[in-house]
UniProtKB/Swiss-Prot annotation:
Family from the record: Belongs to the peptidase M1 family.
Principal location: endoplasmic reticulum
Protein name per UniProt: Endoplasmic reticulum aminopeptidase 2
Listed GO biological process terms: adaptive immune response; peptide catabolic process; proteolysis
Listed InterPro entries: Aminopeptidase_N-like_N (IPR045357), Aminopeptidase_N-like_N_sf (IPR042097), ERAP1-like_C_dom (IPR024571), M1_APN-typ (IPR034016), Peptidase_M1 (IPR001930), Peptidase_M1_aminopeptidases (IPR050344), Peptidase_M1_dom (IPR014782), Peptidase_M4/M1_CTD_sf (IPR027268)
Record organism: Bos taurus (Bovine)
Annotated binding of Zn(2+), by residue: H364, H368, E387
MF GO annotations: metalloaminopeptidase activity; peptide binding; zinc ion binding
TM region(s), chain numbering: 8-28
Disulfide bridge positions per record: C415-C454, C753-C760
Name of the gene encoding the protein in the UniProt record: ERAP2
Cofactors that this protein relies on: Zn(2+)
Length: 954
């Protein structure tokens, strides 16, 4: 697509019109060298065939830009009894080039009629001309054929009447149900359009670049309410007792942000400092669980308005807990929808982790009101500009608004999580081509979200928080109500200097940042766009290899590949053409100051000012790279940890544990060396570091347990219970202490009970018995609920009682804990019953099926059961979840990513190949095959070492 609207050849009138009227919000440049009519006339045989057998006049997946929408007028009438809806719309469009057809998106809609009026027709109230409608479902497009060619630079009004069933899944305009305390099932209608499902609710230009205003009217029964992006203006009484709600016209926005709901929910409301009304909606029986969300939403909205120096532009903000919701939440402008467990908080059954999750998701979605809604990416290849920023802003906002949640200490795990994905060759660049609806859905992954956030955090550390904040404010203000791309962000970050700032390479530092390290940066003359292109336009993560030679540090960078060893024949090919501009940081035994250097070459040398005993790179794990220390580097750091680990920052200790075990997977560090590093953990007081060490040891335990390698399983179990006995024994069974104290408690006790630690089993059994005897009325501390339920689920009586309580519970947090516990049963018939209930979607909602299959597959007794179910029911699963959607990807990865034998690899490969059009092209399949291969290599290389190390350690 062209970079500037100046490239358009318009007459003087159109140039003026675009500049004065459209440019502040939308000025779409043609992506084609000739008009659609010219292309069609030149070679009509190259075009597809519509459903009626006629030639469909458009053959691209992307819509032509000769006609652009300015305003939609929508009238929707859902029937919650017959579960369908009828609707009509008028779209005001601007014709930029003469054409005889208009191409729109439409999916599963029955078009009843379509007509067209010119500006003159509208002015003189002339009836519209009927249009011929052609449909091409393969591209989810319709063509409106006009009798006479539409004239360039004029506006027209397109009127369409249509109808459809409310969707059965979780996309478009769909139905959702909930049960009241009295056992009644009630139905609501709700929308979820991102990324490409607005076309399931109304014919539209369903691409993010086509921003427009929306005026929405909804018809409903009096027992329901209607919600939409904007406040309600008025309600009109219609014949037959129906009501018609009219909503204010929206600001200019993309179709995927349009939202409306018809429901019978109740709400609690508050007001932000700026006067914006904030409301939390939920089903009536769950109203009491909305109060924490209201507190958090008001506080976070106040924060963002201040931080971005831009007022939230709408008069109200509604947050709604939806009973059936596939993802965590959706940032519809002014009407944010959530899965119930992402918004509701029950003080009795919601744990510390639940509270952190709810707060984090609210922070994420509110950040989208600026990043994504106010400024939107041009196309889905840059979805990271929405999602990476929203994830990054979770960190920034929660550090200020909820410091007691200590979110800063958990952000490193955001980066560690995506490194597992990004270190595979099947990864993709942050900014990646996406054309089809399935490819677009697959872009919503850890790379776009987490890696996006991590490189932004690294860039913030590089530029300084002050400079970075100025840059993003500049970016948001410049592109308000418009679309942006990668380069626009780098330009904004490079051009926000104030008087007196030091400048270099287009970016700036305030006087307060003029340290020796900063001056070294300035001498590097870094070009920000060039630097960040190495992080967004190529996949993967760099490995920085450090070797200390006297008072010099020899640095080398290469691509870090998990599961590919340097001696493997493909290693060299996979390294070709990879080079990053890495803003490395380090500290030494001689100086705790943070030293900085930009590694732009394959090899480089850094001179130290004085002799040092050790050096630690990637200070506070703020950089997105792995570090390997050659020579005596690792031995020096292991000695340091054992002698006085507090000489390193807590996040540096966390980073060392992570990097060490990642390097084992790449064959760069021996497993015994990494395990030796964890010996200091008995003295560790930083809980994130302690939990990271436990995480890897538990991972190894589950791996050998699944493979039934009994001697290693027993020895590792013995080691865990022996080595971490002091930590286990000091845990209480109460909800007390800091956030990290409570997360340590739940993690350690959960592992101890999983390992059949007698005191843990005894205490959990005691609490479960008391809970059953109280008919579920006993309040068990929320942080240990999962543990107590999991132990209780091991008996038939306990399992059955938990299933009964699952049906009765009004707390989504409690239902999640019960469902997890039920999936830990050792009885396969019980596990199969659970999965069948999940497929049925009544007792266990379909939205929870993916999680259920994931947790069942983690159970050694359920791993093959879950996998067999997926193979046998793939077609049925695709009827419930869209191809490429997060639930489908979770189901595939959850049931196969733990496989570690060649037979399992072959079985999975054959299944994937058999799917063909039903999914064989999905990126997740390549990820899984590579993951299983990595697991196989890990065991082959490291099992003997693990066995030997354990024998010398217990």
């Amino acid at each position: 697509m062209a970079n500037s609207c100046r490239k358009l050849i318009f007459n003087i009138y159109v140039v003026f019109y675009c500049s004065a009227v459209i440019m502040p919000q939308i000025c779409i440049c043609s992506q084609f060298t000739s008009s659609p009519i010219d292309q069609f006339n030149k070679d009509p045989k190259a075009f597809p065939v519509a459903t009626n057998g006629e030639i469909f006049p458009w053959h691209e997946l992307r819509l032509p830009t000769v006609v652009i929408p300015l305003h939609y007028d929508l009238l929707i009438h859902p029937n919650l009894t017959s579960l369908d809806f009828v609707a009509s719309e008028k779209i005001e469009v601007l014709v930029r080039d003469a054409t005889q057809f208009i191409i729109l998106h439409s999916k599963d809609l029955e078009i009843l009629n379509a007509s067209l009026q010119s500006e003159e027709d509208v002015r003189y109230k002339k009836p519209g001309e009927n249009l011929t409608v052609l449909s091409y479902p393969a591209h989810q497009q319709i063509a409106l054929l006009v009798p006479e060619k539409l004239r360039a630079h004029l506006r027209y009004s397109v009127a369409i009447d249509f109808q459809a069933k409310l969707a059965d899944g979780f996309e478009g305009f769909y139905k959702s149900t909930y049960r009241t305390l009295g056992g009644e099932t009630r139905t609501i209608a709700v929308t979820d359009f991102e990324p490409t499902e607005a076309r399931m609710a109304f014919p539209c230009f369903d691409e993010p670049l086509f921003k427009a205003n929306f005026s929405i009217k909804i018809r409903r029964e009096s027992r329901h309410i209607a919600l939409s992006n904007m406040p309600k203006v008025k309600t009109i009484e219609l014949e037959g007792g129906l009501l018609e709600d009219h909503f204010e016209t929206t600001v200019r926005m993309s179709t995927y942000l349009v939202a409306y709901i018809v429901c019978d929910f109740t709400s609690v409301s508050g007001t932000a400092s700026s006067g914006v009304k904030v409301s939390i909606y939920a089903s009536p029986d769950k109203w009491s669980q909305t109060h924490y969300a209201l507190e958090a939403s008001v506080k976070l909205l106040d924060f963002y308005e201040n931080y971005f120096d831009i007022h939230y532009p709408l008069p109200k903000l509604d947050l709604v807990a939806i009973p059936d919701f596939a993802s965590g939440a959706m940032e519809n402008w002014g009407l944010i929808t959530y899965r119930e467990t992402s918004l509701l908080f029950d003080p009795k059954t919601s744990s510390t982790s639940d509270k952190l999750w709810v707060t984090k998701v609210i922070a994420h979605e509110l950040a989208h009101q600026w990043f994504g809604n106010l400024v939107t990416m041009e196309w889905w290849n840059d979805i990271w500009l929405n999602e990476g920023f929203a994830r990054y802003m979770e960190l920034i906002s929660l550090n200020i608004t909820y410091p007691e949640l200590q979110f800063d200490d958990s952000f490193s795990n955001t980066c560690f999580e995506v490194i597992k994905r990004d270190s595979l060759n099947s990864s993709h660049p942050i900014s990646n081509e996406a054309k089809t609806a399935t490819q677009i859905k697959e872009m919503f992954d850890a790379v776009s979200y987490n890696k996006g956030a991590c490189i932004l955090n690294m860039l913030k550390d590089f530029l300084s928080e002050e400079t970075f904040r100025k840059g993003i404010i500049h970016y948001l203000k410049k592109f308000t109500y418009r679309n942006a791309k990668n380069d626009d962000l780098w330009h904004s970050l490079s051009n926000n200097c104030l008087e007196g700032d030091s400048t270099s390479g287009g970016f700036c530092y305030s006087d307060s940042r003029k340290t020796s390290n900063t001056l070294a940066f300035l001498r590097e003359n870094v070009e920000l766009k060039e630097m960040m292109a190495t992080w967004t336009l190529q996949k993967g993560i760099p490995l920085v290899v450090v070797k200390r030679e006297g008072r010099s540090l020899r640095l080398q960078q290469e691509r870090f590949l998990s599961g590919v060893f340097k001696e493997d024949p493909e290693w060299g090919t996979l390294q070709e053409r990879y080079l990053w501009h890495i803003p490395v940081t380090y500290s030494t035994s001689s100086s705790q100051a943070i030293h900085r250097h930009i590694l732009k070459l394959k090899t480089d040398t850094v001179d130290l000012s004085e002799k040092t005993d050790w050096v630690k790179f990637n200070v506070d794990s703020s950089g997105y790279y792995i570090v390997h220390y050659e020579g005596q580097g690792w031995d020096e750091l292991i000695t340091l940890l054992n002698q006085n680990h507090t000489l390193l920052r807590p996040k540096d200790r966390l980073g060392l544990i992570h990097d060490a075990f990642q390097l084992v997977s790449a064959g760069r560090l021996t497993l015994d060396k990494a395990l030796d590093l964890t010996r200091y953990l008995q003295h560790e007081t930083s809980i994130p570091a302690l939990l990271k060490g436990l995480e890897y040891l538990e991972l190894f335990y589950r791996m050998v347990e699944r493979r039934n390698i009994s001697d290693v399983t027993e020895n590792l179990k013995h080691y865990l219970l022996q080595y971490f006995k002091p930590v286990i024994d000091t845990q209480s069974w109460l909800d007390e202490g800091s956030v990290w104290d409570r997360m340590l408690r739940s993690t350690v006790l959960k592992l101890a009970c999983y390992l059949n630690h007698a005191p843990c089993i005894q205490k959990a059994t005691e609490l479960f018995s008391q809970w059953m005897e109280s008919s579920g009325k006993l309040n068990i501390p929320a942080d240990v609920l999962t543990i107590v339920y999991s132990v209780g689920a091991q008996t038939t009586a306990g399992w059955n009682y938990l299933l009964e309580q699952y049906e009765l519970s009004l707390s989504g947090a409690e239902k999640n804990k019960i469902l997890y516990a039920l999936s830990t049963s050792k009885h396969q018939e019980k596990l199969m019953k659970l999965i069948e209930l999940g497929m049925e979607g009544k007792v266990i909602k379909t939205q929870d099926l993916a999680t259920l299959l994931f947790t069942t597959a983690r159970n050694p007794k359920g791993q093959q059961l879950a996998w067999n179910f997926v193979k046998e029911n793939w077609t049925h699963l695709l009827k419930k979840f869209e191809l490429g959607s997060f639930p489908i990807r979770m189901i595939i990865s959850g049931t196969t990513s733990h496989f570690s034998s060649k037979d399992e690899l072959q079985e999975v490969k054959l299944f994937f190949e058999s799917l063909k059009a039903q999914g064989s092209h999905l990126d997740i399949f390549q990820i899984i095959l590579e993951t299983i291969s990595k697991n196989i290599k890990w065991l082959e290389k490291n099992l003997p070492t693990l066995r030997k190390w354990l024998l010398t350690s217990i």
